[in-house]
Amino acid sequence: MHKKQLMALLMVPQTSDSQDATITKLESAYSDLESLLRSSKQMEQNIETMETRFDLLHGSITTASRRVHPLQSLSMSRKALDTRINRAISPALALLETFKLAESLQNNLLNLSSKLSTEKTHQKRLSKLLDYMDCVDQLNEAINSISEVVEPVIMRLQEVVEFISRTKAADQYRTQRLREALITLKALYETEVDEMRFEGLLDQALLHMQDEFEVLLLKLKHRKLGDMSHMQNGGEDCDDHFEVSFELGSELEIEVLRRISNTLAANDCLDICIDIYVKVRYKRAAKALMKLNPDYLRTYTPEGIDEMEWENLETSITLWTQHFEVATKKVLLSEKKLCESVLGEIIDGLIHPECFVKISDKIMAVFFRFGEGVARSNKEPQKLFKLLDMFESLEKLKPYVLEIFDGESGEDICARFRELEKLIIDASSKVFWEFGLQIEGNVDGFLPPPQDGSVPKIVRYAVNYLKYLSTENYRTTMAKVLRTELTWKTELMLSSKQSETDEDLLKHAICNVMEALQRNIESKRLSCKDKILVNIFMMNTYWYMYMRTKNTELGDLLGEKYIKESYKAVAEESAYLYQKQAWLVLVKILDQDDDDIKEQKQGKEKSIGRLVNEKIETFFKCLSEICDRHRSFYSIPDVDLREQMRDSTVKLLVPVYAEFLESYSGFLQRKVYPSPQRLQGLLGKAFGSTNDWNLNGGRNSGSLETDIRRSR
């Protein structure tokens, strides 16, 4: 910098005054430069001196480092040894603390057990049980912790002791202390740990909890089943009743049972827990159902069912439908909820469905086998209505069964339920169709009509049977059976069948049976030689069929036109033929246009009188015979039909008789014959009154000839 200033001064033009000043400045700059050079030289000397000192210091440090290095290695070894010992000692100390905790918990467990044994109040006892289980769970956790860490702790401690003994890294006192700690832990492991797990207070507590579990489960009883009439109505109210009223146990009881089951499962007692639960709850469920007195379930084979009297079987089936509903919708539904509440947390909820099915399987099997026995028994006609009751009951129960026994564990029960329903449907359809076949071909189709021409029992039975089947109680169920059967038989239904309603199916089926009944009647007609009896039989039978179906649900199903054409028309035709064959012969006897009378009119009056008397005598003789047959053999049980036939006969005979008497009264002076009014009374007596008529076919004895003679 001074050099630049000097050069600047030299380059500037100088005056005389300024030259002196410049020289002065130059001299000053020179002096400064000289001083600076001296300082630099001195500094160079100082630096050389410091370099020498640094070399000496570096040599000293190197020597010290060589002397300290062994001590540093020894310190690091000491720290590593301390770390290794601490890693073994710390878990051992924690293990000892856990032993102390386990000992404390065992003392608490003894105190709680003593208090629990003296407590009599149920609610307080349940609360103490919860405290007891809390202590058991804590003790179990402590013992499990000991069992998990004791072996690794012993192994680490043993490695440290062996290392110290081998390397002499610690003093004898410390080594001896570690060796004694190792021996103590080994002794605890070999004796107390297994005893704590399998033979100590924990094991006793688990046994005690098993007993408490069983006792508490036994206390959860199903309420009195009582009157089951409400179950016949169904509906939402009934469902709500099941949902609300049939819970088992209080919340506290359920909580205690749940805690016990979880604790037992956590202590390798799951199998014992399940065995106790299934045994006790099956016992309770079965005992509740036994109060309904289901003794009828003892008979379940088809052969045994066939041997039962019908009244007993009918009652048994009715009870079966009721009891099956109670068992499913009350008892087993309650058991499922209890099972889910108590065992639902074990193995992520996989246990409780299996347990519930074990409880339910035997109960459901008893009901299944009775239903299967009924379905496989003889297909007697009267069983149809009870089979339909069973089917309707199963249909109502189906959604409950499928919901209660959902999942893989309940598949077998659901499958057997569906199989039972199939058996009932198949049995119902077979009973119905075999009934039609029996009517047509076997029952009494080849026998002649009843001797009095009354309605055969098979007709009465069949008509009333079908009337009952057509009522609101059964027509829908029977139609559903027929529809299901048709679906089974044909995978691809014809279009005509697809459009056919359930009512059409039922109508077609009933028409088939009615037609079979008509063929049965026809076979009886053909086997009878008495034409009058045949017509009375046909008239009575078809009139009965018409009147019993008219204005009924069966008549509505068949249709008014059908029953008029099929039954009423036949009855009217038979009535006409009956009158023609039974009574028209009397009209012909008194026929005034008879050729004999015409011939006699051309002759003598005496001959006419004789012929008239012969005709009138023949008339009354035939009348007596016909009336006697009506009184003794022929029967028209229906009052209205009998009155109609009486009135029709009176209209047929009395006018002809009156005209004959009026025309030939002059030839009948020697004898007195009944008046037309008297004849009308005699005909009415021949047909009989309601009181005189024997509805079983028998008629009051005695001859009408006596009455005729008295009336003369």
From Swiss-Prot:
Induction comment from the UniProt entry of this chain: Accumulates in roots, in a RAM1-dependent manner, during colonization by arbuscular mycorrhizal fungi (e.g. Glomus versiforme). Triggered by RAM1. Induced during root nodule symbiosis with rhizobium bacteria (e.g. Sinorhizobium meliloti).
Highest taxon, organism lineage: Eukaryota
Subcellular location, record wording: Cell membrane
Tissues in which the protein is found: Present at low levels in non-mycorrhizal root tips.
Signal peptide: 1-18
Pfam families with a match to the protein in the record: Exo70_C
Sites where a glycan is attached: 111
SUPFAM superfamilies reported for this sequence: Cullin repeat-like (SSF74788)
Membrane topology: Peripheral membrane protein
GO cellular component, one term: exocyst
Main subcellular localisation: membrane
Parts forming coiled coils: 26-53
Database matches in Gene3D superfamilies: Exocyst complex component Exo70
Record keywords, A-Z: Cell membrane, Coiled coil, Exocytosis, Glycoprotein, Membrane, Protein transport, Signal, Transport
Gene null: resulting phenotype: Abnormal arbuscule development (reduced arbuscule branching and aberrant hyphal branches frequently distorted in shape) during arbuscular mycorrhizal (AM) symbiosis with AM fungi (e.g. Glomus versiforme) characterized by reduced STR and STR2 incorporation into the periarbuscular membrane (PAM). Normal root nodules development during symbiosis with rhizobium bacteria (e.g. Sinorhizobium meliloti).
InterPro entries from the UniProt entry: Cullin_repeat-like_dom_sf, Exo70, Exo70_C
GO molecular function: phosphatidylinositol-4,5-bisphosphate binding
One GO BP: exocytosis
Family the entry assigns: Belongs to the EXO70 family.
Subunit structure: Subunit of the exocyst complex that mediates vesicle tethering during exocytosis. Interacts with VPY at the periarbuscular membrane (PAM) around the arbuscule hyphal tips.
Job description of the protein: Component of an exocyst subcomplex specifically required for periarbuscular membrane (PAM) biogenesis during arbuscular mycorrhizal (AM) symbiosis with AM fungi (e.g. Glomus versiforme), especially critical during the early branching phase of arbuscule development; probably involved in STR and STR2 delivery into the PAM.
Protein name from the UniProt record: Exocyst complex component EXO70I
Species of origin: Medicago truncatula (Barrel medic)
Taxonomic lineage: Eukaryota, Viridiplantae, Streptophyta, Embryophyta, Tracheophyta
